[in-house]
Amino acid sequence: MATFFPGESHTFSEYLLVPGYSSSECIPNNVSLKTPLTRFKRGEKPAITLNIPMVSAIMQSVSGVDMGVALATEGGMSFIYGSQTPESEAAMVKAVKDHKAGFVESDSTLTPKMTMSEVMALKEKTGHSTMPVTDDGTPRGKLLGIVTSRDYRPSRDDHSALVETFMTPREKLIVGDKNITLKKANDVIWENKLNALPVVDDYDHLIGIVFRKDYDSHKTNPNELLDSNKRYMVGAGINTRDYAERVPLLVEAGADVLCIDSSEGFSEWQKRTIEWVRANYGEDVKVGAGNVVDAEGFRFLADCGADFIKVGIGGGSICITRETKGIGRGQATALIDVCRARDEYYEETGVYVPVCSDGGIVYDYHMTLALAMGADFMMLGRYFARFDESPTERVNVNGQYMKEYWGEGSARARNWQRYDLGGAAKLSFVEGVDSYVPYAGSLKDGVCLLYTSDAADDPEIV
């Protein structure tokens, strides 16, 4: 017979914050949102500390290279999705680690034979008005020219005109060489009154572009999450099947932390995965685990050696695990229970294992609630899927710009080894749906507004 939990199971929406006393010192600038990402012993410091308590979900529709760079710039961390081949995931991790701050790889690249109408469509799709022209249309092709909004007039010009007829050709461009520093690139931009500076290699292949508009942003990112080599930090998702093949590639690519991505974390399969990582890498490779919804699940994974533990089953906005399997728990109740277990575990063992609240965030204030309930940080899917930096298309739905968003348990994500219990057999069990989320512009604007709000709160919970 099943065990019945006494009391009710609550979601975040059933709680409110009672504002506490605000002194003259209680201002956002005096608040630090730094939080541990990985386990540590009493008296020691964690190996990895987040500068803001936010990480992006291990999802195809959320966490790609652009999200990895953008979120690390703001002090959080992105977990590259594992529902792809080990080689392609490792390549994404490497791209984030190799990213040179300020040098942007174009995702709006043209060929000379494209038409003005295609340029306009690409501008509408990406929002970018500066587009390099390369011989093969790739971001690393040979640079032939550049197109900006000043090179054509849609209201007067022939929309069938070829790019090669109105682009600014290579011989008229000022470019930077592959060894140029960001400071020097910005100097060239200002001295020559440029809006953008293409950077090329010895063979004139495009490496990236430095934009004038980014100059100030690089001076106003004190929260950047960097490793000891001043590279952006990034995480990566793994599963309980191919870890022996995947983990070495991710470690070689430079992943700072791994996380087992599963809808059910209280399992022998997660234990085996963590044990394999420890046997092959010791404590050098950090690995989080989950998801669980009670104290027993937390203690199991903590004893297995998980560096952090995710809480939440079925609470995601596009997750239907509760409807299809009948398992889960109200996110607020689960979080309170697990955080209490974390504190008890720390008192008993002297080891602090951070808790990540994963799912159940419907409104922004729910994040403040999650932190007030004890979460060390939050993993967010829908919230980050709305921004420019998520990997999905921006589309127009009934006159409103939206971004595509789908769950890792959906048919679209192909159930890529996540929603199972491990072992050799593969299941095809739909636990997520496809959807759209309202487009919200750049991540920087949204996150800055949010963590300023979180820092201003000094609540009690009712």
Regions from the language model: what does each represent?
Residues 1-117, 125, 423-453:
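N-terminal capping/small domains of soluble enzymes
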Residues 79-85, 262-265, 311-325, 369, ...:
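Glycine-rich phosphate-binding active-site loops on the catalytic face of alpha/beta enzymes
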Residues 54-57, 78-80, 232-238, 258, ...:
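Hydrophobic faces of well-ordered beta-strands that scaffold small-molecule active sites
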Residues 80-85, 142-158, 194, 198, ...:
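Short beta->alpha transition motifs characteristic of CBS
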Residues 1-24, 108-111, 176-177, 183-187, ...:
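Alpha/beta catalytic cores of nucleotide-metabolism and tRNA/nucleoside-modifying enzymes
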Residues 451, 455-462:
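Single conserved hydrophobic/aromatic residue that forms the stacking wall/gate
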Residues 86-92, 212-223, 244, 264-281, ...:
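Active-site-adjacent beta->alpha loops and helix N-cap segments on the catalytic face
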Residues 27-50, 57-59, 88-128, 133-136, ...:
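Bateman/CBS regulatory modules and CBS-like beta-alpha motifs in cytosolic regions of diverse proteins
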